[in-house]
């Protein structure tokens, strides 16, 4: 198993410690206790970072205290993860953009947010190490095809906290368009099945962000589909 120590655990863990774990939920093991009898001599305490190791920006703890997040608006690591999620199979499903290629695009300053994928210089892409004209043509075709995706895929791709593929499908079929979702109130959102108040607030916060608004407008200009192909189940948003 791989254990993550980003949680604020009430356990004094030191580097090199042996711990007892148990299965918690479906995936993540839970650390129960440290086996002090096996602690290495001179073991050093583990300290959570106060700054991002990539961009150096301060980190903040989630409201629920479960994780630390980088506050750097232009953090390369965040951009890499955001782009990888945006193009993933459950999101916009853009084939041919693995993590190594995404990092190439970032290093070459060819992308600074997901909307830049729809304005790629494919001639320049073909000149990148390991690429070529065929790879560029295949990527261009995949990017163009993604413009026709259902709204649910775009909602998933945006990376709104707690809005995965399942919630994205419910939201898309309920509101019918991205514009309608952007204009939804807290009451509108919490009335949607499986959308609780925390998720609803995350959605409102996302759309209130100038950075998100800019991304959405750039996606609109690129003719990315903002409509759901599924029947709208709530006529209030038709």
Model regions: which residues?
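DNA strand-break repair and replication-stress modules
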Residues: 79, 86, 128-238
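Short, small-residue-biased leader/transition segments that mark boundaries at the very start
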Residues: 2-9
């Amino acid at each position: 198993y791989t254990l993550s120590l980003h949680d604020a655990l009430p356990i004094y863990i030191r580097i090199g410690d042996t711990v007892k774990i148990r299965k918690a939920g479906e995936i993540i093991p839970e650390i129960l206790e440290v086996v002090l009898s096996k602690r290495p001599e001179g073991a050093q305490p583990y300290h959570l970072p106060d700054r991002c190791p990539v961009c150096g920006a301060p980190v903040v703890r989630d409201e629920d205290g479960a994780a630390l997040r980088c506050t750097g608006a232009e953090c390369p690591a965040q951009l890499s993860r955001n782009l990888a999620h945006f193009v993933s199979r459950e999101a916009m499903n853009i084939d041919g953009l693995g993590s190594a290629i995404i990092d190439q695009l970032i290093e070459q300053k060819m992308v600074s947010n997901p909307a830049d994928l729809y304005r790629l210089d494919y001639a320049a892409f073909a000149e990148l190490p390991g690429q070529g004209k065929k790879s560029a043509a295949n990527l261009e075709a995949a990017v163009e095809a993604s413009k026709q995706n259902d709204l649910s895929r775009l909602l998933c791709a945006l990376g709104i906290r707690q809005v995965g593929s399942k919630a994205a499908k419910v939201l898309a079929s309920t509101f019918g368009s991205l514009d309608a979702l952007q204009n939804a109130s807290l009451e509108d959102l919490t009335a949607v099945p499986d959308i609780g108040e925390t998720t609803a607030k995350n959605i409102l916060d996302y759309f209130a962000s100038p950075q998100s608004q800019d991304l959405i407008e750039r996606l609109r200009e690129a003719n990315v589909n903002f409509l759901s192909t599924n029947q709208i189940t709530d006529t209030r948003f038709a």
